[in-house]
Amino acid sequence: MGDRWSDPLDQWPDPEVYIHYPSGQYLAYMDVRNLNRAFPGRPDGTLTERTTYAFMEFIRREGVDVAIDLQEAELQYPVISTVVTHQKGQEFATMVSMTLTDLEGFKIGTEFSPKNLHGLSHREIGDHSQAVSLLFEAPEPFLDATRGRTSADVLLTGQDEFVVKAGKHGLLFETIDEKGWPIAVRVGRHTSSVAQTIETWTEDHADRAVVARGIPRYADLVRNGVGYYLRDPGKASPSRLAYE
């Protein structure tokens, strides 16, 4: 699992109010360490700002056409099971979401990046580079405030009786039942989303075609599980393993 927060041991202290650069927008104090509130960054800023600036420089210098941010959202969050797109990519993202919904066996919508909400990848990458910026959100009950005990099991199975109960009371923006949202389903949504983004882009931009082979799709992940596509660390040389 990734984490978009900079450690306070590496970036301290937090300000009373976080003032986003370069917009000057006031954000919550803790978002000063939030990677997805610090785009486009600056070379002499905080650790988080320098990190996002490095991403931006890579995108600009390498001439990246499409930047994809893969995220998961709690079911109590309204922006879920969707593609969030910069206005430069509205038609493109809509075609991707329509194709996924029609062919892949899961529904995914389209949301447009708010022009006045700053620091997010889908806003700032599109504003400060040539790239079309997309963000894909998959459902993740592990993140919900109404969940029960936090455990690796909840992370992997996506099952939680308290989140199910919240859904029965109309408190969720995505459906859930006792089957939950297993990690294979969530990963499969993302792999299919990336693959379809590549295919749709290549169909429309033959001169800038992207070639990618062997990407497992949603149905493959649901059928085989995530572990099927990963190397077994138990069989790896100890010199190749890193523990954190």
Language-model segments: what does each one mean?
Residues 10-20, 103-116, 142-160, 241-244:
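Hydrophobic transmembrane alpha-helix bundles
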Residues 117-215:
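Active-site-adjacent mobile loop/cap segments within catalytic or ligand-binding domains
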Residues 58-61, 99, 103, 197-204:
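Structured segments of extracytoplasmic/periplasmic soluble domains
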Residues 72-142, 147:
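Active-site-proximal helix/loop segments of hydrolytic enzymes
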